[in-house]
Amino acid sequence: MSAASDDEFPCYLRAYFPCRIDYTKFILGEDSHDLRFTVTLDPVPRKNPLMVIYDGPTDDGDTLVTISKPKDHLGKLSTTIQVSDIATVLSNRFDDIHRLYKFSLKVGGSRREKFEWRPSEGKEVQEMFRHAKGYKLVRLKSVGPGAGKGGKRKDRQLDETSDGKEVVAVWATKKSLVPSNLRMDVKPFKFELRASGKSGELGSEFGYFALATALRIWSYKALGITGFRITD
């Protein structure tokens, strides 16, 4: 798999949209002078991937990640994320009142761990935008930086959940009073690796999977793209 231009996955990314009302192609970068990835999005119910992430500031670069169309089966949405020859499935249920998104991944060689995106308006998310909302990625088999004490938001350690787990990534967008399917402009997207997600402990592929799963959830929460009945 081709890597980003400086051979390290960036810890922070934001989306840049060439057109404010077109979300089918956008660029991710640490800032407007350091554009790292191009993302194409196909919202039509056909067999093309939902998203493809390319290396560099155009879609002429190498394909780094493919994100399948989410498939709806018996109230469960499943999205396949492919990075090189490694794949995982991001899943969630419509009847899940906690709105959790789950996947598993091999980290540190052969050890498989479970991860969970949880909705959040905590400090890690609020740092990204004024009036932000988003999700935090929780490493389920972990102890947070506050020795796993957890607790209420105002009291607990940064990058630790209320149940004492480690937060390894976050993504955020801006709150809006207008439903996503009625908005004419594109809601923003910011992403950041944190704690062991940032240190490299979770492996060289982790950043790509964290980013791809974050973009999939953003496409639903901010753009209203849900499940598909795939046609030719």
Label for each model-derived stretch:
Residues 52-56, 106, 140:
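Predominantly extracellular/luminal cell-surface or secreted proteins
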Residues 15, 41-42, 90-93, 126-127:
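Beta-strand elements of modular eukaryotic interaction domains
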Residues 63-66, 87-90, 113-115:
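Short beta-strand segments
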Residues 38, 50-52, 102, 116, ...:
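Ordered hydrophobic segments in well-structured contexts
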Residues 1-83:
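Extreme N-terminal segments of fungal proteins
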Residues 71-107:
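Extracellular-facing segments of soluble proteins and assemblies that are Gly/Ser/Thr-biased and enriched
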Residues 1-34, 109-232:
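Low-complexity or membrane-interfacial segments used for flexible interactions
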Residues 21, 46-48, 76, 96-98, ...:
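Eukaryote-biased feature marking scaffold/signaling PDZ-domain proteins and nuclear chromatin regulators
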